[in-house]
Design a protein with these regions (language model features):
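Negatively charged
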Residues: 1-256
Length: 256
C-alpha cells in the first residue's frame, strides 16, 4: 500500500525504487486516481508473491505495459486491475501467471476495456475466478481459448455485468470442480444465445441469479445440467424477458 490513496499524484518515477527484496505489492498504487501513466520497466518484482489490488482504482490510467514486470512468483492477483475504469488497452501476453491461484475480481469494473485476450495466460493453478470480468460493460470481445480452469472452484459473477458481450465461447471452460456459478452471467443483456453443452455442473451448489437480466436470451438448453448438488436457484432466470424455451435434462429435475 506504498502509494495507496495518493489521489492527486499525476506521475510517478519508479526507476530508483529498490524493491529487489519486496515480497508483497498488495494495493501498491491503489486509489491513485490521477495517475495517467506508469512506467513499470524498472520495477523489480522478482520476489513478489502478492499483487492483489496493485492498480485498483487507478481510474485515469488508459494503458498499462506489463511486459517488463516479473511475476513468476506471484500467487495472488485478486482485484489487480479493479476499478481501472479508463483502461482501454492491456497487453497480458508477457504476464507470467504460472503460480497464480487467485484471480477473483481481477478486471472488475474495467469499464473502458472493449477486448481482452487471455489465450497467453497460464491459469493452470487458479482456484478462484469470482467476478473476474464483472462490470466490464463495454467488453465486446473475450478470448478464452487457451484458458485452463481445471482447478477453479468459484466462478460466481464471473461475467456479471458484461452487457456488451454478444457471444461467449465456453467450450474450453473446464468446470468439473466448480461449486459456485451464482450470478455467473447476470446482466449479460446482449447475449442472444449461449452454448452450455460443455459446462460440467456436477459439483455446483449455487446457481442463484445465474442468468438474471439476460434479457436477449430466447432459449436455453440445460439438458446437460446436473443439479443434484445445487442448494440455491433463487432468481436463476429472473429478468430473462425474451426467454421462450428452457430445456431440462434427466439430471436437472431440481430446476423444475
Amino acid at each position: 500500500e506504498m502509494f495507496s490513496g495518493c489521489t492527486a499524484l499525476p506521475s510517478l518515477d519508479l526507476s530508483r525504487l529498490g524493491t529487489s527484496q519486496v515480497t508483497r505489492m498488495w494495493g501498491m498504487f491503489s486509489g491513485c486516481s490521477s495517475l495517467t501513466s506508469l512506467d513499470l520497466s524498472r520495477l523489480d518484482a522478482s520476489q513478489v508473491t502478492n499483487m492483489g489490488k496493485m492498480f485498483s482504482g487507478c481510474s485515469s490510467l488508459s494503458s498499462l505495459d506489463l511486459s517488463g514486470l516479473h511475476t513468476s512468483q506471484v500467487t495472488d492477483m485478486g482485484s489487480m486491475f479493479s476499478g481501472c475504469s479508463s483502461l482501454s488497452s492491456l497487453g497480458l501476453s508477457g504476464l507470467d501467471t504460472s503460480q497464480v491461484t487467485d484471480m477473483n475480481g481481477m478486471f472488475i469494473d474495467c469499464l473502458a476495456l472493449t477486448a481482452l485476450d487471455l489465450s497467453g495466460l497460464d491459469t493452470s493453478r487458479v482456484e478462484n475466478m469470482w467476478g473476474m470480468f464483472e462490470g466490464c460493460s463495454t467488453l465486446a470481445s473475450l478470448n478464452l481459448s487457451g484458458i485452463d480452469t481445471s482447478r477453479v472452484q468459484d466462478m460466481g459473477h464471473m461475467f456479471s455485468g458484461c452487457s456488451s458481450l454478444a457471444s461467449l465461447d465456453l467450450s474450453r471452460l473446464d468446470t468439473s470442480r466448480v461449486a459456485y456459478m451464482n450470478g455467473m452471467f447476470k446482466g449479460c443483456s446482449t447475449l442472444s444465445s449461449l452454448d452450455l453443452s460443455r459446462l460440467d455442473t456436477s459439483q455446483v451448489t449455487y446457481m442463484n441469479d445465474m442468468f438474471e437480466g439476460c434479457s436477449s436470451l430466447t432459449s436455453l438448453d440445460l439438458s446437460g445440467f446436473d443439479t443434484s448438488r445445487v442448494r440455491n436457484m433463487r432468481g436463476m432466470f429472473e429478468g430473462c424477458s425474451s426467454l421462450v424455451s428452457v430445456t431440462i435434462g434427466e439430471k436437472g429435475g431440481s430446476i423444475l
